[in-house]
Amino acid sequence: MNRSDVLIIGAGPTGLVLALWLSKLGVRVRIIDKSSSPGTTSRALAVQARTLELYRQLDLSQAVVQNGHRVGAANFWVKGEPVTRLPLSSIGEGLTPYAFLEIYPQDEHERLLIERLEAFGIRVERTTELEGFEETGDGITARLRLPDGQLEICQTCYLAGCDGARSIVRKTLDTGFPGGTYQQIFYVADVQGSGPAFNGELHVDLDEADFLAVFPLAGEGRARLIGTVRDERAERAETLRFEDVSSRAIEHMKVQVEQLNWFSTYRVHHRVADHFRTGRAFLLGDAAHVHSPAGGQGMNTGIGDAINLAWKLAAVLSGGAQAGLLDTYEPERIAFARKLVATTDRVFSFVTAEGRLADLLRTRVAPFLLPKVASLETSREFLFRTVSQITLDYRGMPLSKGVAGHVHGGDRLPWAHDGEGDNFESLKCLSWQVHVYGDTSDEMIAWCNEHHLPLHVFGWRPAFEAAGLGRSGFYLLRPDTYVAVAETCSDPKVIERYFRDHGIRPFFGSP
């Protein structure tokens, strides 16, 4: 009987990243997908800064940036003219190595992940479908329908449902999926064209209650149009054609469409599962939460789910932690998912609201306020931190402890760079580690050496103070680079006690 450590259902970005992380840590992975081949079209485009930071651990960031398209600015149009230009690169400057919005279509993204996964000898098993599963004490027994129609019974220690909004894993677990469906029909079109909206920047039309944006793609004259319709056209979504929706882009944003490469329509839901874990089965990505595409958050959130769960599964499976560590996955990720759904719902509701007041706010007030907001450093920083997901934290969660400087346990480690070095360089290692900014004690050095815990001591510099880091304390960092302990002293007993209390024996890097 086929037995794996982790059986992953679904080979979208979430499932592929989970498989890649686990494979890099020596976990026996099996990943299946009911589709016969990878997707050749996609809806997801944006790769946020936090995802690129985490991708450094998998040596993926450079490939994504090189093959994608960096968006330098967002333009807002009213009555056929661009009225506001918001420079994106300056908004996040100094906060992250990736102070920009990266456009990298999901189909290309998946091909990159599959290629890297195959380098570990792991292939996605296509045309293979999960029919059901049961927990059997020390594992899970799953029933798979194979490409030839045969039924396979296999065993796995843990099962990860990355199988989308219609997840068979979630349905088998009988987990509730409360929420609703937007009345609008979304459409997406890949086009070759020209015009002022094809200058490599993002363009958004604010004229009407229906959303319309032009996203640049890599390559001359390539763009993706994403929009909504809610009138009588929405009642016949299955027969909607590009010609039915293209006039607004042509008339309002002066788009000259030379070739239509792909067109599709779909409905969007906003839902969060009641639970992200039941026993040995986990829900990730769209199987756990779906929401409006506003802000380009969905795919990035699923990838965040995968990375959060991967290091915990690897630690438990290797004997580096007690099984209780897995209890922290749901509270850490479900809180963010609920907040995200509420936030994107508010943004989408504003952009698509109807009525004279809503029209006035969109076409008159927003174009006036946006540049004012962008000129204020605090507003700029808040906007970038939120959209880029670098503001996501696990404060107040069971694995988070202490505060040093302005950094709390559960925070993303702030990026500090002043030309002398980058404190993120050591984070490429998939392990627990300690960062000290300033001086540390001989006891800390000796303890870390004795326990093979990587210790990185950075001489104190103004850049660290500017980033909010505390001087001469320490930060214990989790394998997913979030701060576990922020401490003002340099006593290694704090680390020893933390590991003991949480049943963790640090799991160090790739085998």
For the regions a protein language model found, what residue spans apply to each?
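N-terminal Rossmann-fold NAD(P) dinucleotide-binding loop
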Residues: 15-16
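Conserved FAD-binding catalytic core of PHBH/FMO-like flavoproteins
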Residues: 82, 115, 122, 158, ...
